[in-house]
Structure formats: C-alpha cells, structure tokens
Amino acid sequence: MREGSALPGAPGAAPVPGFLAKLWALVEDPQSDDVICWSRNGENFCILDEQRFAKELLPKYFKHNNISSFIRQLNMYGFRKVVALENGMITAEKNSVIEFQHPFFKQGNAHLLENIKRKVSAVRTEDLKVCAEDLHKVLSEVQEMREQQNNMDIRLANMKRENKALWKEVAVLRQKHSQQQKLLSKILQFILSLMRGNYIVGVKRKRSLTDAAGASPSKYSRQYVRIPVESGQAMAFSEHNSDDEDGNRTGLIIRDITDTLENATNGLLAVAHTSGRDRETQTALDPGLPICQVSQPNELSCAEPIPPVHINDVSKPNEMGNVAVELHTAQANAPEDPVSVIDSILNENNSGNQNDPLLDREEIQDFLNCIDASLEELQAMLSGKQYSFGSEAFSDVFNPELPALDMNLMETSPGMENIANMEDSTEDLGASERETAGSKGGQEGTESCDSSVLFQNCVLKWNFSSL
C-alpha cells in the first residue's frame, strides 16, 4: 500500500502514510497472529516472535529484514515501547514479546490513523534570532581578547630582546673574566720565575768600607778582597771608561794574573775601577790593602740597555795562565719611559757627589734605600699596564747568568796595559802584607761583590721597563 492511499473498506478516508497502512494491515492479518497481533485490550500491538517477524514478515511488507530499522520508524511516528511493571518494579521479560502503543493506533479505529504524523525536526526561527545586545557583548569580548593577545605579543618581544642583551652581557663578562684569569696567571708565572731565579730586591745590608790612603775614590767605592786561588794566580776586576771614538763607552775588565812569586801559594782578587780619561790604574794604595783600587764610573744611567758582554782571552808567550777578560758596557740613548724618576734620582746622586770622599755606612744605606724606593715606584707604575709576555720571556730577560755572552778569544783586550802594572805591584808586595790585607777585607769584599751583582740586576730590570 502506497502512502496517500485510503485503507480498504474505508471509502472517502483521508490519505494515510504508507508505513502506517502497512503496519495496520500486518496487525489486522489473522494469518500472522502467531507472530504479531493486538493486545488483549486492543490498545497496543505485540510482536510475539522477533526472529520470525524479521525473516518472514518484514521482507514481505517492507522489503528488508532489519528489525532495528522497523523500530526506528515506529519511533519517528510516535510509537513507544511498553515496559511491563509489577508492583511498581520493572519485571524481566520471560519471553521475547515486544509491545508498542500509540494513542491513535487502536484496534477497530482505523480512522484515527490520519492523526498520526511523522515527526519533523522543526527549527524555531525565534531561536535563530540573536539579540543585538548579546552580539555586541560577544564582539566586545573578542576585541578585548585581541588587545590582550597583542599586549602579550609585545611583552614577549621585549623579553626576547632583554634576554638577548643579557646573553651578550654574559658573553662580555665571561671574556673579561677569562682575560683577568690569564693576566693573573701571567703575574703568578712571573712571580714564580723570580722565585726560581732567586732574585733579591730591596734587601738591606750593612756594608763596611775601608779608606784607601793616598787615593781619590769616587762616591761608591769597592774594597779589595784577597781570595786564595789554586796554582798561585790572582784575579783582578776593574771597571773603566775606554778611549773609543766617541769616548762614551764604559767597561768592566776582569783580569787573571799569574803570580810570579815562587813562595806564593794564594792568589789575589783585586777589583779596580779606572776612569776613561787616563785608562791607568790608580797606584796609590793603602799599606794594609793590596794592589789596586775600586772606583765608580763618572756617569751611570740605569735606564740604558746593556749590550752583550765580550769576554776576551789572551795568553802571553812567556807567562801561562795570564788571561784578560773584558766586559764592555755600552751606553745608548734611552727613550723617555716611566722610570725617569729613578734616572733623575740616580743622576743627582752621581753628579753631585763625584768628588766627595768615601761615604760612611749611613750614606751607603740611604743610597740603597733610595734604590729600594725607586724599585717599588717602578713596580707600582708597571702594575697599571698589561703585558703579553709569557713566563719564558720574563725568565730570559731576568736571567742572572747573562745568556748573551760573546766569547771572543782572538781579540786582544784594550786594557792589557793595566796587566803589567798590576803584575809589578804584585811582585812588590810581601806575603805577610797580602795575608793581612786578605784577612781584613775578605768579608767586606764578598759583600761588595754581592752588592755589585744586585745593582746589575736592578739595571737589567730598569732596562726592561723601557722596552
């Protein structure tokens, strides 16, 4: 039966949907009462055997055998499943009977079928209409959220820039820290190199001086020391100003003199400073002192660089072991540097007191204190500068062994004239006089040699500061 056709036996009836007409014919068919039929009161219809209904009747009327689809169709037309109640409790169905009911689907009332309508999802137009105030409120909230999002984006960008700047600052600080660590390491290496070299700066010692009668010593004179030497030899040290082309060079001559006395068993160590003008050893000696006199050069510049030292070894044909060793110290024009204060102090001390007699112990001590103060001032000046010298460079500069020695054994010493004079004066002295002079001046000469080495080390340090 198609939708819109009238039921049989009901002429002039309103059109009924096809599903309802088929359902009515199915329930009214007496041949299918064992599968589907009316209830006892005629208000509902019951499906007695669900499996047979799905296999036999559904394909015959609805062209499918899906019981679930049939139940969905019933729900769309308003049919409800009847639940059995007993004493207000839902009772479990003992069989597979399913019962449905509808207010207009009753036995003997076929005319009520036209009142059964299929449910249509009606959309209310009122629900679609949105109030203008609500819409404005939603738009305002969206705008506020956008502003907050923009503010968050700006803050995030600022934080990124600050983070980048902080990382750059951290990198700079790390670089500075690394430079400070390197500088500190170099300073420590420099200090350790000084400690390994056994350098002594600013050590105050008491030095005793002995007057030499008949001589005109300079301000800072040195005494003679008689040191026993094997094979009857004597060593003579003299510092003089050689007569070169410009007359400005100064030198220290170390002479090894063979003792010609037959009974002499000890050598003589004599230190003599000669001036550059006459180049002759001062012969005026004290009766208690041996051989020669030590005198300071007229001018001594602490800022001048010290060139390599030449040691000349010359042997005479008639005398064995007669060696002359000369150490030349050239003067050069040093540029102005931070140690000008030290130079001025030393120049004042040297130029103002060249012709004075021998200084006493207190004046020598004051001079050494002045050198100590000058060294401390130099250290304070250099502490504010940064040097890139390694520990090896410092060790090479402050090496007390003077590695730049030039051993020239074929060159004749320019001070060979003093050797004959010193030999003659040695022959004139007696063994008793030499022993007496050696016992008196042994300790004093040792201290004088230590002070000379210390002063040369100071000169080396001042020359390094002018580089």
From Swiss-Prot:
Residues 16-121 bind DNA. Residues 128-201 are annotated as: Hydrophobic repeat HR-A/B. Its main location: cytoplasm. The keyword Kinase does not apply. The keyword Cytoplasm applies. One of its GO terms (molecular function) is sequence-specific DNA binding. Disulfide bonds: none annotated. One of its GO terms (cellular component) is nucleus. This is Heat shock factor protein 3. It comes from Gallus gallus (Chicken). The gene is HSF3.
